[in-house]
């Protein structure tokens, strides 16, 4: 039984490790984007109040489109 179970376990671990690495990379990218957006929003909000909302919405839409393309 151990001989039959070992190869399947190894494959499962390999798939999990690869998936985790990809997920971690995506998480880091998202965190970096959010930090950049927060910094940008803070500086923009201090300078102007109303136009920032429009630019922020455009940025969010562009990021969502890019993420969807990457996922596919």
From Swiss-Prot:
Species annotation: Fowl adenovirus A serotype 1 (strain CELO / Phelps)
Residues recorded with modification N-acetylserine: 2
GO cellular component, one term: host cell
UniProt GO molecular function: DNA binding
Induction: Expressed in the late phase of the viral replicative cycle.
Miscellaneous comment as given in the Swiss-Prot or TrEMBL entry: All late proteins expressed from the major late promoter are produced by alternative splicing and alternative polyadenylation of the same gene giving rise to non-overlapping ORFs. A leader sequence is present in the N-terminus of all these mRNAs and is recognized by the viral shutoff protein to provide expression although conventional translation via ribosome scanning from the cap has been shut off in the host cell.
Domain of life: Viruses
Secreted is among the record's keywords: no
Protein's UniProt keywords contain NADP: no
Listed name of the protein: Pre-histone-like nucleoprotein
Swiss-Prot/TrEMBL site (Cleavage) positions: 14-15
């Amino acid at each position: 039984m151990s001989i039959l179970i070992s190869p399947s376990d190894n494959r499962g671990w390999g798939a999990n490790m690869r998936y985790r690495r990809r997920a971690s990379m995506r998480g880091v990218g998202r965190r970096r984007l959010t930090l950049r957006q927060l910094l940008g929003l803070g500086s923009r909000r201090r300078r102007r109040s109303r136009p920032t909302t429009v630019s922020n919405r455009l940025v969010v839409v562009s990021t969502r489109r890019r993420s969807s393309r990457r996922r596919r």
